Swiss-Prot record:
<comment type="similarity">
    <text>Belongs to the isochorismatase family.</text>
</comment>
<dbReference type="InterPro" id="IPR000868">
    <property type="entry name" value="Isochorismatase-like_dom"/>
</dbReference>
<keyword id="KW-0963">Cytoplasm</keyword>
<dbReference type="Pfam" id="PF00857">
    <property type="entry name" value="Isochorismatase"/>
</dbReference>
<comment type="subunit">
    <text>Interacts with CDKN2A.</text>
</comment>
<keyword id="KW-0539">Nucleus</keyword>
<dbReference type="InterPro" id="IPR050993">
    <property type="entry name" value="Isochorismatase_domain"/>
</dbReference>
<protein>
    <recommendedName>
        <fullName>Isochorismatase domain-containing protein 2B</fullName>
    </recommendedName>
</protein>
<dbReference type="GO" id="GO:0005634">
    <property type="term" value="C:nucleus"/>
</dbReference>
<feature type="modified residue" description="N6-succinyllysine">
    <location>
        <position position="178"/>
    </location>
</feature>
<dbReference type="GO" id="GO:0005739">
    <property type="term" value="C:mitochondrion"/>
</dbReference>
<dbReference type="InterPro" id="IPR036380">
    <property type="entry name" value="Isochorismatase-like_sf"/>
</dbReference>
């Protein structure tokens, strides 16, 4: 097993886990880009299962917010219910069973709430956190973008589902690459993030103005 260097953010199937956060029925009509982010989280789940990466799923106050949406494809997974914004407290025992764990791949909602709190708690544990930005969203675009910036300030790696999947596979000679390639062929749509990353790029340029 290769050791992941924190400065590089490399990820390996044998030392990674996928967190799926609170993609529930009652949030369907409240969250920006909900179908798109669930679709990207679903392909993360498919690839994680193909590569035998552990997956943990939570539901936030399911009595009020309902069950996980079926299109995520998580019907066979054990679901942990929670009231804390962070996923870490209800999943603590599961994490303790994985001494080899180095990297957490994080998808779900809401970015400024449960995703941010989960990411900070995981960083506190000394884990690398990789947020799939195309698989996370919020009710408010401003809260979503500010939360992404806040996580990046704290050391979270911002990525996309495809970037993470290709990091995990690493080689077109991988025995499952052709199947994974089929999963990646769905069209990519803008979900409001191009401006965020364009702004990041401009902030690095001399004499740039916001």
């Amino acid at each position: 097993m290769g050791a992941a260097k924190a400065s590089l953010g490399r990820i390996f199937p044998e030392s990674s886990i996928l967190f799926l956060c609170d993609m529930q029925e009652k949030l369907r009509d409240r969250i920006l880009y909900f179908p798109q982010i669930v679709s990207k989280a679903a392909r993360m789940l498919k690839v994680a299962q193909m590569l035998e990466i552990p997956v943990l799923l939570t539901e936030h106050y399911p009595q009020g917010l309902g069950p996980t949406v079926p299109e995520l494809g998580a019907q066979g997974l054990r679901t942990m219910s929670k009231t804390s914004f962070s996923m870490v407290p209800p999943l603590q025992q599961e994490l303790d069973k994985l001494p080899q764990l180095q990297s957490v791949l994080l998808c779900g909602i809401e970015t400024q709430g449960c995703i941010l709190h989960t990411a900070l708690d995981l960083l506190d544990r000394g884990l690398q956190v990789h947020v799939a930005v195309d698989a996370c969203s919020s009710q408010s675009e401003m809260n979503r973008l500010v939360a992404l910036a806040r996580m990046q300030q704290s050391g979270v790696f911002l990525s996309t589902s495809e970037v993470l999947i290709l990091q995990l596979v690493k080689d077109a000679a991988h025995p499952q690459f052709k199947e994974i390639q089929k999963i990646l062929k769905e069209p990519v749509t803008d979900i409001g993030l191009l401006g965020f990353f364009q702004g990041k790029k401009n902030s690095l340029l001399p004499n740039s103005r916001t």
